[in-house]
Amino acid sequence: MILLKLYLTLAAILCQSRGTTSLDLDDLMTTNPEIQNEIINKHNDLRRTVDPPAKNTLKMSWDNTIAESAKRAALRCNQNEHTPVSGRTIGGVVCGENYFMSSNLRTWSFGIQSWFDERNYFKFGFGPTRAGVMVGHYTQVVWYKSYKMGCAINLCPNEPLKYFLVCQYCPGGNVVGR
């Protein structure tokens, strides 16, 4: 019995120390300037860690028009295909797009980090390190010419991965040969 109490106490402490808190969808809405700053700071922090170091990467900034476009994409709940180019062309500029889907609500930092972690399968100057791996999210996050972005989140209750995070980046990246 003493071991059970000790185990439960340790489990409670570990959950608290790992920052396990209940998230609410409203806590992650990108209309909140604090969330916008979290997203921008996470992107800029990760972009600074690119290896080899990039000399000409532009700093990301938030753009409300792009965020509205990302919101339209998130509201579609179409997790199988990206927004058509015509739906993510803003001011004549084609924007790139990343999706993150999850059955559990995750923070923006978690989703952005998951995109960035595709770097493990990418080699600069070569591309994907093996067939079938995803690296396009990573390359869009670090694309040197992208400097404006906006993101949105939506609950898609009829999807198995019901939480849908979308970021759009302008100008878009992933241009073959660059």
Curated annotation (Swiss-Prot):
Organism: Varanus acanthurus (Ridge-tailed monitor)
Disulfide bond entries: C77-C156, C95-C170, C151-C167
GO molecular function, one term: potassium channel regulator activity
Main location (coarse class): secreted
UniProt PTM: Contains 8 disulfide bonds.
Tissues showing expression: Expressed by the venom gland.
Family listed: Belongs to the CRISP family.
Name of this chain's protein: Cysteine-rich venom protein VAR3
Keywords: Calcium channel impairing toxin, Disulfide bond, Ion channel impairing toxin, Neurotoxin, Potassium channel impairing toxin, Secreted, Signal, Toxin
Protein's cellular compartments: Secreted
Pfam families tied to this protein: CAP
The SCP domain, residue ranges: 41-169
GO CC annotation, single: extracellular region
Annotated signal peptide: 1-22
Superkingdom of the source species: Eukaryota
Lineage: Eukaryota, Metazoa, Chordata, Craniata, Vertebrata
Record function comment: Blocks ryanodine receptors, and potassium channels.
